[in-house]
Amino acid sequence: MKYAEKSPALWDAIRQEEKRQQNTIELIASENIVSDAVREAQGSVLTNKYAEGYPGRRYYGGCQYIDQVEQLAIDYAKKLFNAKFANVQPHSGSQANMAVYQALLKPGDVILGMGMDAGGHLTHGAKVNFSGKEYKSYEYGLNVETEELDFDQIRKVALEVKPKLIVAGASAYSRIIDWQKFRDIADEVGAYLMVDMAHIAGLVATDQHPSPIPVADIVTTTTHKTLRGPRGGMILSNNLEIGKKINSALFPGIQGGPLEHVIAGKAQAFYEDLQPQFTDYIKQVVKNAKAMAEVFDESENIRVVSGGTDNHLMIIDITDTGLTGKDAQNLLDFVNITTNKESIPGDKRSPFITSGLRIGTPAITSRGFNEEDARKTASLIIEILSDPDNEATIEHVKKEVHELTKKHPVE
């Protein structure tokens, strides 16, 4: 059914964004490229349907096919992560986290999460976020020397503040996380353990990172990033009693009608993630990240935080280049390499300026980049950050970026 002509301004902006994605090396760790099937599902007629409630328990009629779609997403998710419970309705990772807090906590309860400058997320207790306003939040950090999780410090803080909930997981941490150590600390202080695996869910699904599902009380994730699905959230658990609380906290607690067209996209993505080639993809994501980290680590003026990576991302300290993270992000944008500024451990600069960059490989790997391409990309970043005012350098890097994007088009 047609109601009106397309907005020329809108579709011009969409075409320009499509062109930008095609011609840019995308290194933002939280971004990826979905399949045509995921886009088709998300753009389907399901966007027309309201479906408050859960499969078999809706407040609206006409949901028989919607129920099938959402149940497929639930079943695929449970199989993918070997979990007994899955809620696929959260509109985002933040709302997934909010639902957990609403289900398990009361306003003013104590939560303990990773500090922002250590690699944590806003929703892990940052003072500017609901999680740091509605709850009494404390933070843990990294070992100053290793720049890895300091479990002695985490235990010490937990014993002091007696949290009701400990949040494990990160948005900018490049090492394997020992979930059992968090579990032991949570048990010692009588806290729930929630794991936010938004960044590493694809690695967990393919056994490239230990799974938190058997260890944590509750696990949240986004469905994009390394899962290569539509933008959205999900909650998983092996505790069915907690699952019941989660369902009620999400709906009717904090959300109304679920976005069933997005849930269809999630179902398609989870189906793709269950195929053997997805494991091959994730393995290549990690190989590409390690290859980039090695190149950065060999440079004279760029340092990889913690000395390397075990997953899909790394944080690079660019202090010795004389540039701020904001400067570097803008400079790289100019040569068609997209990154994001990132605080480094103990960063003295504000989160709007920073002393580092976060680099991730999910999107370039989806385009077909291999280790050689990843090393080349890292070398180009070093070249431009080391010589930012040289027009010849800028033009050379632009040319090389164009060749790489032409070699590996977005398909």
Curated annotation (Swiss-Prot):
The top EC class is transferase
- What biological processes does GO assign it? glycine biosynthetic process from serine; tetrahydrofolate interconversion
Listed A to Z, the keywords are: Amino-acid biosynthesis, Cytoplasm, One-carbon metabolism, Pyridoxal phosphate, Transferase
Query: What would be an example GO MF term here?
Result: pyridoxal phosphate binding
Where does this protein chiefly localize? cytoplasm
Record's InterPro entries? PyrdxlP-dep_Trfase (IPR015424), PyrdxlP-dep_Trfase_major (IPR015421), PyrdxlP-dep_Trfase_small (IPR015422), Ser_HO-MeTrfase (IPR001085), Ser_HO-MeTrfase-like (IPR049943), Ser_HO-MeTrfase_PLP_BS (IPR019798), SHMT-like_dom (IPR039429)
Query: What does it catalyze?
Result: (6R)-5,10-methylene-5,6,7,8-tetrahydrofolate + glycine + H2O = (6S)-5,6,7,8-tetrahydrofolate + L-serine
GO cellular component terms listed in the entry, alphabetical order? cytosol
Q: Which domain of life is it from?
A: Bacteria
Which cofactors does this gene product need?
pyridoxal 5'-phosphate
Q: Where in the cell is it found?
A: Cytoplasm
User: Which residue stretches, if any, does this entry annotate as coiled coil?
Assistant: none
Pfam families from the entry?
SHMT
Q: Does the UniProt entry include the keyword Ubl conjugation?
A: no
Residues annotated to bind (6S)-5,6,7,8-tetrahydrofolate: 120-122, 350-352
What positions are marked as the site Plays an important role in substrate specificity? Answer: 224
Q: How does it assemble?
A: Homodimer.
The text of the family note is:
Belongs to the SHMT family.
Function text: Catalyzes the reversible interconversion of serine and glycine with tetrahydrofolate (THF) serving as the one-carbon carrier. This reaction serves as the major source of one-carbon groups required for the biosynthesis of purines, thymidylate, methionine, and other important biomolecules. Also exhibits THF-independent aldolase activity toward beta-hydroxyamino acids, producing glycine and aldehydes, via a retro-aldol mechanism.
Q: What is this protein called?
A: Serine hydroxymethyltransferase
Q: What is the lineage of its organism?
A: Bacteria, Bacillati, Bacillota, Bacilli, Lactobacillales
Its gene?
Answer: glyA
